[in-house]
């Protein structure tokens, strides 16, 4: 079941080649008219253009024989009455005083804005729905496909962990917990965007014009701000997941601001816990190649533990702590070993990345403790898990991910990042912090020490392993 949230509006959409003197026809833009409604212009491939047009008058069905109360009350729109001619007729009125004609129509349709959210996203953690089955809204801001893919991405990695026997079924309950809130946020945004898009524009100083009735129109500056915010929302970068077994916000404090909104732990003052981790440039310690951190965390179902030990060359205590981590993480009962099947690649469930703040030439690669540069069944070293987070690249580019994340180069920090790139936890860089990471995983992961995979054949050339799925293999 789904609940209607807001009043429906009627829109027409048409893909065609425009013939017009409107100067912004090849720019994505919104056109507000004083009396004739609104229109959105979206340039497409080649010379095609899509117009979303607010329709003022559309015939409705009588609703007889319908079991739907809304249809009985006022009837659904009669889609057969929405034609290219009726859509363009309205567009011409909206775009005045510019001229508009069309040719090469490739597609058109009409729709009602029905803003709804399903009452539940699953049944007994056995049947799940996502995307349009969960939430419907206007298509104008581009959020539909993006939010739907984020639904399935959120659900997908959790199903993979459960189906592979790596995690408890409890994590499936967090799908509705996390995504239903996003759906309601989506509807609230869509309602505001649709209201601003559909309303009459505010006429500056209208109250001073004799006989004017337009003083209460849409503020176009506000519309632009919502438009920009919509891009962030549609991309998923501001989806904020609340505290649960998969998100631990202990130590994080809420903060509001145009560019900083969320729950932040002072150990990583610019990293909102529960949101997607922002990426920045780092330098590979072994090869000094400049790379985005996100490119080293592909979407393959694995968790990442990002250790920021600070400047381990300048602060010897930080270096000593990093070496103490080795005894903990190399032990048979460490969270790395407990939750990775026997004979699987060492980092195939939880991958540890070390991002220090020292100059690359101050520390040799093989001086780092073993857990940071593990070897596989053939003795091959994993070179791509140690990075320099501060310094200069060969081309002179300044690198400082510590500044980007708000991490002190003496205090350091540890971040746990989920397979969907959302930050699950921020803790101090210490043995106590490492224990908190262990407790986080013990809340939902299943012990794999009795899950023995077949031994790998050392005689086979397995270079394809870099292209194959990496989760628990």
Segments predicted by a language model, with ranges:
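Conserved FAD/dinucleotide-binding core of flavoprotein oxidoreductases
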Residues: 34-113, 161-164
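Short FAD-binding loop at a beta-strand-to-alpha-helix junction that anchors the flavin cofactor
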Residues: 122-139
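Helical substrate-recognition/capping region of FAD-dependent monooxygenase/halogenase enzymes
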Residues: 69-75, 89, 93, 161-473
């Amino acid at each position: 079941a789904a609940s209607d949230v807001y009043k429906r509006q009627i829109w027409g959409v048409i893909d065609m080649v425009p013939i017009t003197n409107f100067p912004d026809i090849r720019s994505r833009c919104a056109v507000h008219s004083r009396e004739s409604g609104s229109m959105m212009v979206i340039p497409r491939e080649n010379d095609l253009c899509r117009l979303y047009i607010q329709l003022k008058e559309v015939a409705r069905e009588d609703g007889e024989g319908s079991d739907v109360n809304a249809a009985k009350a006022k009837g659904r729109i009669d889609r057969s009455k929405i034609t290219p001619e009726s859509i363009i007729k309205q567009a011409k009125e909206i775009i005045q005083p510019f001229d508009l004609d069309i040719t090469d129509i490739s597609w058109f349709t009409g729709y009602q804005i029905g803003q709804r959210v399903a009452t539940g996203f699953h049944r007994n953690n056995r049947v799940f729905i996502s995307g349009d089955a969960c939430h419907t809204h206007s298509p104008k801001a581009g959020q539909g496909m993006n939010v739907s893919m984020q639904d399935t991405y959120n659900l997908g990695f959790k199903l993979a962990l459960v189906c592979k026997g790596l995690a408890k079924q409890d994590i499936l309950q967090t799908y509705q917990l996390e995504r239903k809130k996003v759906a309601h946020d989506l509807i609230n945004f869509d309602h505001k965007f649709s209201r601003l898009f559909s309303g009459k524009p505010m006429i500056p100083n209208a109250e001073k014009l004799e006989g004017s009735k337009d003083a209460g129109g849409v503020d176009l500056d506000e519309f632009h701000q919502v438009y920009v915010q919509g891009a962030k929302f549609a991309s998923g970068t501001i989806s904020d997941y609340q505290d649960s077994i998969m998100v631990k916000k202990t130590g994080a404090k809420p903060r509001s601001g145009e560019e900083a909104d969320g729950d932040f732990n002072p150990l990583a003052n610019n990293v909102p816990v529960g949101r997607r981790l922002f990426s920045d440039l780092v330098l590979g310690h072994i090869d000094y190649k400049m790379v985005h951190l996100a490119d080293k965390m592909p979407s393959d179902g694995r968790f990442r533990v990002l250790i920021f030990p600070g400047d381990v060359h300048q602060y010897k205590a930080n270096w000593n702590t990093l070496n103490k981590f080795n005894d903990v993480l190399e032990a048979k009962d460490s969270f790395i070993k407990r939750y990775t099947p026997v004979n699987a690649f060492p980092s195939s469930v939880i991958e540890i990345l070390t991002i220090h703040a020292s100059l690359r030439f101050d520390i040799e690669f093989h001086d780092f403790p073993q857990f940071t540069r593990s070897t596989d069944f053939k003795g091959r070293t994993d070179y791509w898990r140690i990075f320099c987070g501060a310094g200069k690249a060969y081309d002179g580019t300044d690198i400082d991910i510590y500044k980007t994340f708000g991490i002190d180069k003496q205090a350091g920090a540890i971040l746990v990042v989920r397979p969907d790139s959302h930050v699950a936890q921020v803790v101090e860089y210490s043995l106590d912090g490492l224990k908190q990471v262990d407790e986080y995983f013990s809340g939902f992961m299943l012990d794999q020490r009795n899950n023995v995979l077949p031994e790998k054949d050392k005689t086979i050339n397995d270079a394809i392993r870099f292209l194959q799925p990496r989760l628990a293999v």
